[in-house]
Amino acid sequence: MNRYWAVLLLLFSAAAHTPAQTISPVIQEYQGKADGKFQIYNDGEVPLTVVLEPHSFGVDATGNPTFRKLDPEIHVQLSSTSFRLQPKQTYFVFYKASSETLPNWFCIYATVTGGTTSTGIKLALQLPHTVYLLDKNALNPDQIAWVRAESSAAGNKRQIVAEVENHSNAFSRVRDVQVTSANGKQSFAGFPLFPGQRRLIELDWDGSAAPERIQLDFDHFKKESDLKAASSAQ
């Protein structure tokens, strides 16, 4: 009988989980080399098989990742590459990682498989642990440039479209995005900003007044821009 895999990917979130399995932490940053660990917990009633495999990845302008084989300059050692996870059991995975070039990043995928459904489908869940190997180079405000920052009407709301570009070789993280109007402010989730990356930001604004400014909050500085009315040709 043919069996099919139903695979669920959970990426770059603050927590990766289903009601039965969790992995934590999901994201970890290190200076230079990594010497870390993560845990996988089986909250279900069925034993699970877990297979670990590291992958390199790139991220496009909209934040969507593309995965590939681990780049040869990244070296990863895992305490285990496969194991059985019993019901209610927590399993710790220890690892060491280094890279010939910094900054660099990779993801360790835990592919979790259990039983089959009544229709013969074998379910698999992929849980990510993402690792960033960073250097000591700090991003400064002059290395971040606004490409555009606009707002336009979108039904009963307004849509904000902005682009920001990292002109450096440093990795950084936008911790928070703030949009303000004459009488209000809204906060939005941040995102990682990779070396040389141009990042598209699309937000829905539901305030009563038109948005006027957008602000990106980094660890040690803020980057602001006025919001212009989008051209009707766009």
Describe the residue ranges of each PLM region.
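Short, hydrophobic/aromatic beta-strand segments
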Residues: V46-P54, G63-N64, C107, F171-V177
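Primarily extracytoplasmic ectodomains and periplasmic/lumenal surface modules that are beta-strand-rich
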Residues: G36, N42-T49, H55-D60, T101-L102
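Structured core of small recognition/catalytic domains
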Residues: F171-S232
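Terminal connector regions
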Residues: H55, S98-Q143, S208-Q234
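Sec-dependent N-terminal signal peptides
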Residues: Y4-A14
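Beta-sheet-dominated interaction scaffolds and their linkers
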Residues: A20-E45, S82, N140-K157, G190
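Asparagine-centered strand-capping/turn motif at beta-strand->loop junctions
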Residues: I40-G44, A162-S168
